[in-house]
C-alpha cells in the first residue's frame, strides 16, 4: 500500500518483523511510502547493495520469487504490473534477520493516484547467477542487463567474463581482420611462395625433360600474372566514385577475374597442343624420379597456397558477437523474427528500427572474386601436380611408357578448365547485370506485395555492382490513403533484413500515376489527331 502526498516531505522508517518499510524522498514534491511484506528464508546476516535503474510512474506490490545461489538464498514475492516511464535509483541496505529495515533514496517523477498499477523498466545486474528466471545459466562471472518495457519487449545483453574476453582478443582480432587486408595479405604471401617454386620447377623440368613439369611451371607463371592482376584490381576498386564513374571502380575486380580465367583457357589450349605433339612425336627419355620429386614439392606448395587463398577469399567468414538480442512480447515469450506476412502497416505511427546499427543482422561472408580466381588457379595446379606424380610413377617404374606424360597433361587440362566454369559464369553474370544467384526475384516480389497498402509491384530489377553488392529498383503502387513514407520504410526493412540489399531505389506510385507507367518502357507518345477538312464548310455551295 502506498500513500502519496504532495508538497510535503515525509521520512518514516519503520522496523517490523517480517515487514519492511520504505521511506522515499522525491525531488519533485511527490512523495509516497509503502510497506512490503517479505518471506525470507535466510538466517545469515547479509549486506547487499542493489542498484536499479528504473523509468516509471509506479505504485506496486512485490510478490515474486528469486532463488540466487550466489551470496544469499532468499525468496521474494513480487507482483509487478509494469507500465511506467520514470527513472529512480535504489540504494538499499538489507539486514536479513527476519527484521528488515529498508532505506530508499529515490529521485522520481510521480504523477499517479493511490492504488494505481504501474508498468516499469528494470535494470538488473547479477553476478555469477545460475538459477532464476533471467539468469543465463552456467557458473562463473556473468553479467545481465535487462530492460523491460510495458509488455512491449525487453532487451538482454549477456556478456562473458573478463578472463574470457582477454583470452579471446587475439582470436577476435584475427576473425575481424578487414576483408580487403586479409585478401591482400593472402595474395602477397601466395605470390611469394609461387614465384620461388616456379623458378625451381622450370630448372627441374628442363633437366628432367618433362613436359608435365614444364606445363606445371607454365601454370605457375599464369598464377603469378593472375595474382598481380588481382592485386591491381583490388587497389583500383578502392578508388572513390567520380563524376564519370558514379558507381566507383568496384567492377575492376570482375574484369580482373575474367581476364584471369581467359589466361587459364589460353594457356590450357597451348598445353593441349603440346601434349598432342608429344603423343604424335614421342620425346627422348624422361627422368621419372626427378619428375616425382618436383611434382611432390609442387603439390605441397600448392596446398599451402590454396589454404592461404581460401582463408583470404572470405568465403566462410563469420562474425561472433559477445551479446544476444531478444525481444519479448506481451505474453513474455521470445518474439522471433517477424514473418513476412506480419510485416504489415498496422500502425501508421509505428517506428522503424535503425537497420544500420551494430546489433543488426550479421552478413554472411562474401568471397573476394580476385582471390577466388587465384584460388582456382592454384587448385588447377594441384590437379596438375597430382597428374604429374601419377605420370612420373608410371615412367619411373616403366621408363618406356613415356606417353603417360602427355596423356596426364590432356586429362588434367580438361579438369582445370572445368574448375573455371563457375568463376566465368559469375563474372559474366555481374557484367551482364544478371540477378544474383542467391536472390529469388519472385520471392522478393511476393514479399513486397504482402505489405499492407501495396496494390501492385512492377518494374522490379535486381543486379550486382560487384559480388556481394546487390542493388534493386522497383515501383510500388499503393492505396491513396496510405502514407508513402511508411511503405518506403517497411520495404527497405524487408529488403535489408531478408535479402541484404541496401542499395535500393523505390518509387512509390498512386493508382493514377501507375496507369501511365508500363514495365521496362516509357509510355509511347499519344498519336496526333488528324484534322478532317469539310469541303462543305470550306467552300460555299454553287448556285
Swiss-Prot record:
Question: Any ranges marked Extracellular in the topology annotation, and which?
Answer: 208-216, 273-289, 397-402
Quote the cellular component terms of the Gene Ontology held in the record. Answer: contractile vacuole; pathogen-containing vacuole; plasma membrane
Give the Basic and acidic residues compositional bias ranges. 56-66, 76-104
Q: Which domain of life is it from?
A: Eukaryota
The answer to whether keyword NADP applies is no
| Keywords for this protein | Ion transport, Membrane, Metal-binding, Transmembrane, Transmembrane helix, Transport, Zinc, Zinc transport
Ranges annotated as spanning the membrane: 187-207, 217-237, 252-272, 290-310, 376-396, 403-423
Q: What does the record say about its membrane topology?
A: Multi-pass membrane protein
Q: What Pfam families does the record tag this protein with?
A: Cation_efflux
Say if the entry is tagged with keyword Transmembrane.
yes
Topological domain (Cytoplasmic) residues are: 1-186, 238-251, 311-375, 424-543
GO MF entry, a single one: zinc ion transmembrane transporter activity
- Where would you say this protein principally sits, based on its record? membrane
Write down the SUPFAM superfamilies for this protein, in alphabetical order: Cation efflux protein cytoplasmic domain-like, Cation efflux protein transmembrane domain-like
Q: Which family does it belong to?
A: Belongs to the cation diffusion facilitator (CDF) transporter (TC 2.A.4) family. SLC30A subfamily.
- In its UniProt entry, what is this protein called? Probable zinc transporter protein DDB_G0283629
Amino acid at each position: 500500500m502506498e500513500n502519496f502526498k504532495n508538497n510535503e516531505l515525509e521520512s518514516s522508517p519503520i522496523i517490523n518483523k517480517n515487514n519492511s518499510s520504505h521511506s522515499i524522498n522525491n525531488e519533485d514534491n511527490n512523495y509516497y511510502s509503502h510497506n512490503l511484506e517479505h518471506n525470507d528464508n535466510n538466517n545469515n546476516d547479509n549486506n547487499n547493495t542493489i542498484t536499479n535503474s528504473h523509468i516509471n510512474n509506479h505504485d506496486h506490490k512485490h510478490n515474486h520469487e528469486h532463488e540466487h545461489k550466489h551470496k544469499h538464498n532468499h525468496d521474494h514475492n513480487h507482483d509487478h504490473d509494469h507500465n511506467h516511464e520514470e527513472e529512480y535509483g535504489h540504494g538499499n541496505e538489507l539486514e536479513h534477520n527476519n527484521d528488515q529495515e529498508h532505506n530508499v533514496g529515490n529521485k522520481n517523477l510521480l504523477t499517479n493516484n493511490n492504488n494505481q498499477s504501474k508498468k516499469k523498466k528494470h535494470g538488473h545486474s547479477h553476478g555469477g547467477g545460475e538459477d532464476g528466471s533471467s539468469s543465463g545459466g552456467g557458473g562463473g562471472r556473468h553479467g545481465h542487463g535487462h530492460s523491460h518495457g510495458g509488455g512491449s519487449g525487453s532487451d538482454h545483453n549477456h556478456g562473458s567474463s573478463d578472463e574470457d574476453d582477454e583470452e579471446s582478443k587475439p582470436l577476435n582480432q584475427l576473425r575481424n581482420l578487414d576483408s580487403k587486408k586479409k585478401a591482400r595479405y593472402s595474395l602477397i604471401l601466395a605470390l611469394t611462395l609461387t614465384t620461388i617454386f616456379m623458378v625451381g620447377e622450370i630448372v627441374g623440368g628442363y633437366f628432367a625433360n618433362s613436359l608435365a613439369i614444364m606445363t606445371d611451371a607454365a601454370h605457375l607463371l599464369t598464377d603469378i600474372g593472375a595474382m598481380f592482376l588481382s592485386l591491381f584490381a583490388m587497389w583500383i576498386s578502392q578508388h572513390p566514385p567520380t563524376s564519370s564513374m558514379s558507381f566507383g571502380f568496384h567492377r575492376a575486380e570482375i574484369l580482373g577475374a575474367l581476364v584471369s580465367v581467359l589466361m587459364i583457357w589460353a594457356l590450357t589450349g597451348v598445353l593441349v597442343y603440346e601434349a598432342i605433339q608429344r603423343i604424335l612425336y614421342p620425346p627422348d627419355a624422361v627422368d621419372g624420379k626427378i619428375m616425382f620429386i618436383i611434382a611432390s614439392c609442387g603439390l605441397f606448395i600448392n596446398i599451402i597456397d590454396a589454404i592461404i587463398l581460401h582463408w583470404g577469399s572470405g568465403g566462410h567468414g563469420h562474425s561472433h558477437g559477445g551479446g544476444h538480442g531478444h525481444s519479448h512480447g506481451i505474453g513474455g515469450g521470445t518474439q522471433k523474427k517477424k514473418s513476412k506476412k506480419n510485416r504489415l502497416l498496422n500502425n501508421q505511427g509505428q517506428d522503424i528500427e535503425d537497420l544500420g546499427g551494430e546489433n543488426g543482422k550479421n552478413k554472411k561472408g562474401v568471397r573476394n572474386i580476385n582471390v577466388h580466381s587465384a584460388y582456382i588457379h592454384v587448385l588447377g595446379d594441384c590437379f596438375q601436380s597430382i597428374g604429374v606424380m601419377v605420370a612420373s610413377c608410371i615412367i619411373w617404374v616403366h621408363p618406356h611408357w613415356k606417353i603417360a606424360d602427355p596423356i596426364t597433361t590432356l586429362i588434367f587440362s580438361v579438369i582445370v578448365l572445368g574448375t573455371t566454369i563457375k568463376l566465368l559464369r559469375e563474372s559474366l553474370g555481374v557484367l551482364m547485370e544478371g540477378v544474383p544467384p542467391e536472390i529469388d526475384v519472385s520471392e522478393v516480389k511476393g514479399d513486397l506485395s504482402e505489405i499492407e497498402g501495396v496494390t501492385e509491384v512492377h518494374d522490379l530489377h535486381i543486379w550486382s555492382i560487384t559480388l556481394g553488392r546487390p542493388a534493386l529498383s522497383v515501383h510500388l503502387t499503393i492505396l491513396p490513403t496510405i502514407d508513402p513514407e511508411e511503405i518506403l520504410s517497411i520495404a527497405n526493412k524487408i529488403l535489408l533484413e531478408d535479402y541484404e540489399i541496401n542499395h535500393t531505389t523505390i518509387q512509390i506510385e498512386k493508382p493514377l500515376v501507375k496507369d501511365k507507367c508500363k514495365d521496362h518502357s516509357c509510355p509511347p507518345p499519344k498519336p496526333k489527331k488528324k484534322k478532317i477538312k469539310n469541303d462543305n464548310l470550306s467552300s460555299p455551295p454553287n448556285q
